[in-house]
Amino acid sequence: MTLTATTSHTVGPYYHIGLTWLNRENLANEQTLGERVAITGQVVDGNGDVVNDAMLEVWQANAAGKYDHPEDEQDKPLDPHFEGFGRVPVDAEGRFRFTTIKPGTVEGLKGSTQAPHLVVLVFARGLVKHLLTRIYFEGEPANVADPLLECVPAERRATLLARPDAAGVYQWNVILQGTEGETVFFDY
């Protein structure tokens, strides 16, 4: 039997019909171990216009640096109160906000160490395939040796860094395209 791959489709205006029940803007509960963080931002296109129908899918390790996934074989503890996953829709102004915990460092390839980060998939109208990026935390000492950040040109790394404001809320925006400040997206 020969199987044919299913084609990709844009998210379209109706994703909310089948996906809103999966929306979770608070990835950590009161019992989750780790430092609580809030991340807020906005999704805009290359002209700076609001993208008001985007959705962010967030994946991350727990505070010990372990993913709640069977392929993560690190000898680190799982947190029974943390799944490390959430879907976050934007509002009419393209804004989003979610709360979670700051993840621990994660083992990378060939014994390297990845800095604390969140993996973010961006879904939006007009995208045939979702976009993959990461959120790192500004000022995190482990950033200097992160193997993926080292591959990003120095002048573009800022697009991956969430910056804390005066209240301690991290700010991070998604710019879908353009020559000025486009968010770094990764192939996979």
Predicted regions and their residues:
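Beta-strand-dominated extracellular/periplasmic modules and repeats
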Residues: 1-188
